[in-house]
Swiss-Prot record:
GO terms for biological process: female meiosis I; innate immune response; regulation of gene expression. One of its GO terms (molecular function) is zinc ion binding. It comes from Homo sapiens. It comes from the Eukaryota. This is Tripartite motif-containing protein 75. Belongs to the TRIM/RBCC family. Keywords: Coiled coil, Cytoplasm, Cytoskeleton, Metal-binding, Zinc, Zinc-finger.
Length: 468
């Protein structure tokens, strides 16, 4: 019994923990565990820095292993002992049935039991499929052999998965470090912005203090002068009151003509309630610009004949003289409009347009199917989502145009499209503040839309983080 147990233990130690077969060309790794050379090489195939042991997960630093020739010879001995044991087992396999004392010679498929011929008699196994143990053993041996390769593959895949997962902590550290650096950079820029804004606000406050001090000093001087005038008047009144009737009455006209100075007004201190123009959306907008900025160019084939598109397709302006251009089907012929590239079918995208001092413009997105011969885009906002400057006022066109109140004149407009969310948002880049957001369900391709207006000032697509 002890010999059998020892032999079983030897058989287990002689097998690879990866393929579960006898060790082939055995090698030993840093932690002392043994594997087939090909198995450990496959397990470490995609690793570069840390090489975990498939058994104990010890991190081997350089992925080195050494051949174990002595273990290889022991494996051959273990195989020989296994073969001898198998032959002996075959000789001893003639076992008697405990119930009938007959040789166990048949196998019941339904009950998965080895039986003697008497066991197959009714009623215990009546109607069951029984077959000789030789044929049954061949059948199940083939079945078990068919399990070996799938199990080996499953085990190899599992080892590869474990190896991949073992690299995840390093990936996590790298991701956290990258995000930490991004956050540090964002907060550094934010702090720089706040420092500049603080200096500007404090400088304006100091100027206001100086201005109020000067006005207050002038007001005090005015009251001091007026006080001196009143003292002079008092002296004259006392002096006149002591004169005779004739002298008093003869001095009255002179007195009233010379003493007509009015009292100065009281100066009240007034400080503007100034504050930092830092908007709540600043940090989020900076992330949007950094992550989703997309390069936009103009499509000359859609440009109205009175529009001149620059060679780099980044600038467009209106001219009173019509250009001789091919009559492409998508060219606008009524309003001075041009569309841009690329087409948007999905995703999130940000771009920025410099409008400068133009007196009239409209920008946004539209469907690729927007009619080019119409005088204006659909008023119901079904084909074009845009904001505009017209008649010195900002508006969101639609069935019921909505006025937009901007605290600071917009010289550059940021546009953020979230196709899946069905949102297009507009930002005043002068103060990085949100203007408005349209919500709809987008279907089909969308394109950048530019209404240039009838003045010669250009519209320009910004190529950097902000417009120069």
């Amino acid at each position: 019994m002890a010999v059998a147990a020892a032999l079983t233990g030897l058989q287990a130690e002689a097998k690879c923990s990866i393929c579960l077969d006898y060790l082939s060309d055995p090698v030993t790794i840093e932690c002392g565990h043994n594997f087939c050379r090909s198995c450990i090489q496959q397990s470490w195939l995609d690793l570069q820095e840390l090489f975990p042991c498939p058994v104990c997960r010890h991190q081997c630093q350089e992925g080195h292993f050494r051949s174990n020739t002595q273990l290889g010879r022991m494996i051959e001995i273990a195989k020989l002992l296994q073969s001898t044991k198998s032959n002996k087992r075959k000789q001893e396999e003639t076992t008697l049935c405990e119930k009938h004392n007959q040789p166990l010679s048949v196998f019941c498929k339904e009950d998965l039991m080895v039986l003697c011929p008497l066991c197959t008699q009714p009623p215990d196994h009546q109607g069951h499929h029984v077959r000789p143990i030789e044929k049954a053993a061949i059948h199940y041996r083939k079945r078990f052999c068919s399990y070996i390769q799938p199990l080996k593959k499953q085990l190899a895949d599992l080892q590869k998965l474990i190896s991949t997962q073992s690299k995840k902590p390093l990936e996590l550290r790298e991701m956290v470090e990258n995000q930490r650096q991004e956050l540090s950079s964002e907060f550094e820029h934010l702090n720089q912005f706040l420092d500049r804004e603080q200096q500007a606000v404090l400088s304006r406050l100091a100027e206001e203090e100086k201005d109020n001090q000067q006005k207050l000093s002038a007001n005090i001087t005015a009251f001091s002068n007026y006080s001196a005038t009143l003292k002079s008047q008092l002296s004259k009144v006392v002096e006149l009151s002591e004169l005779s009737e004739l002298e008093l009455l003869s001095q009255i006209k002179i007195f009233y003509e010379s003493e007509n100075e009015s009292s100065p007004s009281i100066f009240s201190i007034h400080l503007k309630r100034d504050g930092c123009s830092f908007p709540p959306q600043y940090s989020a907008l900076q992330r949007i610009i950094k992550k989703f900025k997309v390069e936009i160019i103009l499509d000359p084939e859609t440009a109205h004949p009175n529009l001149i598109v620059s060679e780099d397709k980044k600038r467009v302006r209106f001219t009173k003289r019509k250009q001789k251009v091919p009559g492409f089907p998508k060219r606008f012929t009524v309003k001075p409009v041009v569309l841009g590239f690329p087409y948007f079918h999905s995703g999130r995208h940000f771009w920025e347009i410099e409008v400068g001092d133009k007196s009239e413009w409209a920008i946004g997105i539209c469907k690729d199917s927007l009619p080019t011969k119409a005088r204006r885009p659909s008023s119901a906002q079904q084909e074009c989502w845009r904001i505009e400057l017209q008649d010195d006022g900002y508006h969101a066109p639609g069935a019921f145009p909505t006025p937009l109140l901007l605290e600071v004149k917009a010289r550059a407009i940021g546009i953020f499209l979230d196709y899946e969310m069905g949102e297009i948002s507009f930002y005043n880049m002068a103060e990085k503040s949100h203007i408005c957001t349209f919500t709809d369900t987008f279907t089909g391709p969308l394109r950048p839309y530019f209404y240039v207006g009838p003045d010669s000032q250009p519209l320009r697509i910004c190529t950097g983080t902000v417009c120069e």
